[in-house]
């Protein structure tokens, strides 16, 4: 199965691109957990695009997107919800001794 992709684009030296990339680098495990590849591209205007594992466009932002908003967008998809349920079911259940 392929991975999701987040494309951060903007003019060369755009401070918004740098700020968005820094926010994403601050939480690398979040991207890994969500099977997300982050790509930076040069373009005429700042934009952030999220594509699903099937290559379809999930979301597009013309301004900075918070990492929590991004994670929530991904976590709300049916595929990600299923992944979370499967991970929870596979996790060892703690037992409490009385």
Task: Identify the residue ranges that each predicted region occupies.
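Non-catalytic interaction/Regulatory regions outside core domains
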Residues: 1-98
């Amino acid at each position: 199965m392929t991975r999701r992709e987040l494309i951060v684009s903007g003019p060369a030296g755009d401070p918004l691109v740098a700020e968005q990339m820094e926010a994403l680098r601050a939480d690398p495990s979040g991207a890994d957990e969500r099977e997300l590849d982050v790509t930076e591209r040069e373009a005429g205007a700042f934009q952030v695009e999220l594509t699903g594992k099937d290559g379809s466009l999930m979301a597009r932002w013309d301004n900075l997107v918070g990492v929590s908003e991004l994670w929530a967008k991904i976590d709300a998809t049916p595929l990600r919800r299923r992944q979370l349920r499967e991970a929870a079911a596979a996790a060892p259940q703690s037992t409490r001794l009385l």
